Structures are given as C-alpha cells and as structure tokens.
Swiss-Prot record:
Name by which UniProt lists this protein: ATP synthase subunit delta
Assembly mode: F-type ATPases have 2 components, F(1) - the catalytic core - and F(0) - the membrane proton channel. F(1) has five subunits: alpha(3), beta(3), gamma(1), delta(1), epsilon(1). F(0) has three main subunits: a(1), b(2) and c(10-14). The alpha and beta chains form an alternating ring which encloses part of the gamma chain. F(1) is attached to F(0) by a central stalk formed by the gamma and epsilon chains, while a peripheral stalk is formed by the delta and b chains.
PANTHER family in the record: ATP SYNTHASE DELTA CHAIN
Gene Ontology MF: a single term: proton-transporting ATP synthase activity, rotational mechanism
Function: F(1)F(0) ATP synthase produces ATP from ADP in the presence of a proton or sodium gradient. F-type ATPases consist of two structural domains, F(1) containing the extramembraneous catalytic core and F(0) containing the membrane proton channel, linked together by a central stalk and a peripheral stalk. During catalysis, ATP synthesis in the catalytic domain of F(1) is coupled via a rotary mechanism of the central stalk subunits to proton translocation.
Superkingdom of the source species: Bacteria
Entry's family note: Belongs to the ATPase delta chain family.
Annotated compartments: Cell inner membrane
C-alpha cells in the first residue's frame, strides 16, 4: 500500500512540476492558482467526481469526456484543461488530488508562502485569522496562508501545524495532560 502511495505521489509530482513550469514560462501562475482552488473545491464537494477519477472501470473515453465537460463548465485555463485531458488519456486522473496539492506547494514556494494547518474548536473570525497569520509570519518570516478546519471536540483553543512543528493549545489536550498527571499521582 505504501508503495502504491509513493508511486502515485511520484506521478503527481511529475505532472505538477511540468504544469508549474509551463505556467511559470507563460506567466500564468495566477490563473493556475485559481484553477487549483476551483478544482479542489469541486473535488471536495463532489464525491461522484472523486469516484469517477479513481475508478478503473470507467473507460478512458468516458473519463476524457467527463473531464472536458467539467473543465469547460468551470472555465479552466487551456493549460489545465489539456493537462486533465492528458491525465485521463494516460489513466492518471486518480492522482489529481495529489497533483493539486503538489501544485499548491510549488506555487506557495514560488511566492515565499507557507501553509499552516489550523484546527479550531469554533470557526475563526476574520480578525482572529488575520492575527494568527501575522503572529505566524513573525515567527517564520514568510507569508502564512491558513488552512482552517473546525473540530468541536477540542472544546476550546487551537492546533496549529506549520511544517514539522505542531502547537496544541486545545482544552482537550490540556485535559488529557491533566488526566495523565492525575493517574501518575493517584
């Protein structure tokens, strides 16, 4: 299983690098970034699309038609549309989520940005998100893009993952620490 994951990651990185370099050469990085965000949203919102791109049962032709229709409807750039067509022709659409993630990473690196995965007990307000991004920027010296999710089981506080660093200030983890300390004493 790990081998299959590394193979699809390798495929994704090759497609992402090629698409990134072509977009960079043609000055279309902003368009590429817009396409990536749109595709991520569509994949997240449509389990059927995720199933279609991962299905080995659906023929290349049917996948190509579906991808062309979706790309046309979404107004994706010709470069992204052609890449999706090539991926469907080569039966590589299953790697699309990894391609999008790799592309987002390449673009962020190009822009000098880092992404922080933030899990909060409640939805962050715009002011809170801005303050957190500014604080993290001061810490790492780069522009920080927040990728936020809500997990009510945290009770309160945040979990911030930035690169290999994780900061857990959630009430849930504090209670777990307290529980462990009480077990040791009692």
């Amino acid at each position: 299983m790990a081998e299959a994951a590394s193979i699809s990651q390798g495929i994704a990185e090759r497609y992402a690098t090629a698409l990134f370099e072509l977009s960079k050469e043609t000055g279309a990085l902003k368009t590429l970034e817009t396409d990536i965000d749109a595709l991520k949203d569509v994949l997240a919102g449509s389990p059927d699309l995720g199933a279609m791109i991962a299905s080995p049962v659906i023929s290349r032709g049917d996948q190509a038609k579906a991808v062309a229709a979706i790309a046309g409807k979404m107004g994706l750039s010709p470069l992204m549309t052609n890449t999706l067509a090539l991926m469907s022709e080569k039966r590589r659409l299953f790697a699309l989520p990894q391609v999008l993630s790799a592309l987002a990473g390449l673009i962020a690196e190009e822009k000098g940005e880092v992404t922080a995965e933030v899990t909060a007990a409640t939805k962050l307000s715009a002011a809170q998100a801005k303050k957190l991004a500014e604080t993290l920027k001061a810490k790492v010296g780069k522009t920080v893009k927040l990728n936020t999710t809500v997990d009510e089981s945290l009770i309160g506080g945040l979990i911030v993952k930035l690169g290999s660093t994780m900061i857990d200030t959630s009430v849930k983890s504090k209670l777990a620490s307290l529980q462990n300390a009480m077990k040791e004493v009692g």
